[in-house]
From Swiss-Prot:
It comes from Haemophilus influenzae (strain ATCC 51907 / DSM 11121 / KW20 / Rd). This is Bifunctional aspartokinase/homoserine dehydrogenase. L-homoserine binds at residues 667, 678. It comes from the Bacteria. Na(+) binds at residues 606, 609, 611, 613. Its EC number is 2.7.2.4, 1.1.1.3. A sodium ion is seen in the structure; a metal ion may subtly affect the relative position of the nucleotide-binding region to influence enzyme activity, and could increase the stability of the enzyme.
Amino acid sequence: MRVLKFGGTSLANPERFSQAAKLIEQAHLEEQAAGVLSAPAKITNHLVALSEKAALNQSTDTHFNEAIEIFYNIINGLHTENNQFDLNGTKALIDAEFVQIKGLLEEIRQAGKVEDAVKATIDCRGEKLSIAMMKAWFEARGYSVHIVDPVKQLLAKGGYLESSVEIEESTKRVDAANIAKDKVVLMAGFTAGNEKGELVLLGRNGSDYSAACLAACLGASVCEIWTDVDGVYTCDPRLVPDARLLPTLSYREAMELSYFGAKVIHPRTIGPLLPQNIPCVIKNTGNPSAPGSIIDGNVKSESLQVKGITNLDNLAMFNVSGPGMQGMVGMASRVFSAMSGAGISVILITQSSSEYSISFCVPVKSAEVAKTVLETEFANELNEHQLEPIEVIKDLSIISVVGDGMKQAKGIAARFFSALAQANISIVAIAQGSSERSISAVVPQNKAIEAVKATHQALFNNKKVVDMFLVGVGGVGGELIEQVKRQKEYLAKKNVEIRVCAIANSNRMLLDENGLNLEDWKNDLENATQPSDFDVLLSFIKLHHVVNPVFVDCTSAESVAGLYARALKEGFHVVTPNKKANTRELVYYNELRQNAQASQHKFLYETNVGAGLPVIENLQNLLAAGDELEYFEGILSGSLSFIFGKLEEGLSLSEVTALAREKGFTEPDPRDDLSGQDVARKLLILAREAGIELELSDVEVEGVLPKGFSDGKSADEFMAMLPQLDEEFKTRVATAKAEGKVLRYVGKISEGKCKVSIVAVDLNNPLYKVKDGENALAFYTRYYQPIPLLLRGYGAGNAVTAAGIFADILRTLQH
């Protein structure tokens, strides 16, 4: 005998209902089959709402009519498929049931409340009608059907709304029915009968449990749970798209997973199957050829030490603590006896080794009752201050990692908690079962999905993912996108994926939580309708529970730089070539670092100085190793390196500036380069890295241009005026040459001060040969002197700058 149970989604419409029927038929043709059915999807919700609204004397018409319509739709479809289906007879049964429901609703209205026995009678009508429709389907195809009446044949103990089946007595009753071998067996799920013969329920979503009980009573070869997914996954595939299907699980693994929130199987399903070692197979009604997941006692050890990650939401944690608990016998017993007496299920328990406190979780719906019960139980201790006031923390979730292999495996807990820490998720409490089959962490509910994603990434997925949010798509930003596209396959081989989830310019932005299609990103951005808005980005990462978001600023805007502190606080890493943030007032500079440290996220700005050259990282490493910066000089502008190199070759200032502008070495308005302010910012950043606390206004700057030159003029007008300075620079170049020197635009840090100026350097100076757009940075330190640590290379250009940003983005994975 095979038992097949079908859930509501598998019976939701005529097509799915027929598919379920055919699967029962196919099983019956191979060996006798029993079908256990839930109510069609949405029906139980409607029925529950009917009694609730009737008790409040509210209209029930909408729920009543929608429920009937679902049944009518199914039977009409089944009749269309097979005109032998007894449409009129089945419709009459449905109508009769709803007439009875209407009568019960009227009684509820009169009483102003709903008794549990009446509620149970209404709530289970969906299952009863599923059986009526399935019986008609089989009879239309010439089969003889045996209906197992769960009220008469499954003995249960407990309340009207949640009871447990007595398998031994129920087996005797089922055996006494002498079910003929040729009959298709059908039974409504969710229901049983108490010792008085009254209808009772097995708890919401209890049809899985019903099927397991029937399988145990029949001594079935297998209990198949047919649902709308391919089996049991390592976590909810709706939360983590790359969750893995588990081919096998042990009974105990399945019980732990279902207890802590896995939705595929009801927590009590395994209990009746385990004593007889009846396998439980989870299958997909919509994909019956898929192998599914097998749960039994014969699971062999396999590579997966962890089988699943679950989240159980809507919990409250109670902390009972105080000096009166230390060494006092029976305190824990009193706590949990009080909970048991109030009918409150305790889900997780943790106790400090000092015996000073006990913490436990209950469903949040039970929190108020639990608090009242505890305060009553410990009234004397609370009054005498032997106990502190009962603390209740609401809106919590339990994240659990489950697997039989965890007992032998090392480092699972470390990876679990490390993943939560890296996702900036605070842990409220921790518990581990004595079997070492599961580890649980209590976290804020608004972080639960991020916790599942981060934990799954750490335990199951070697692939590291960066979710990139790019602001600024000019030369550098556009080149960065192209590099990301080019490197996709290479990074995939290294198990790294960069998903560009947002692209924004000053006006509009594109968003996609799964990563944008970058093939035609420019055109897509041009046609985007979403205005650029940082608040939308923040809402986006919270809505989609992004685990590793990286905010990349490729603008030079002060306004965007002003967002970094908030971005770090809200959970972004920040990567930027924009120098404005690091050269703002020291208060903001320090705030950025404090926020990065507090949120355990990275603020990376290697390209602030030297574009793709590893300047910042090398300086930080030197200082971390105990070195000290004593003196610095460097050429920090690629455009001015080019310009002064060409002056040396004999070109005039106006000629070389026009050439640099044409080649794109300068800003569209070359005065931005010639003012020296960009070099001043870079020099200030280096000084601050070395621990020198200066403001931008403290940097002494000698610009290339005289003060006031071309003020109020356009860029083109400025270029027309520039020849006025040619003779002066020709003279300065000649004077330097006569002394065996060349002119360079140099930034210096000395004795706690910063200066940017035009300097004549001789052949012995490391900056003498630096030109053609190269940068060179000479660090004289305690360790590096008299010969400095010299970093030299091209420090300008979209490609090298984008490559430096790319490297910083990848460094966030070392988080």
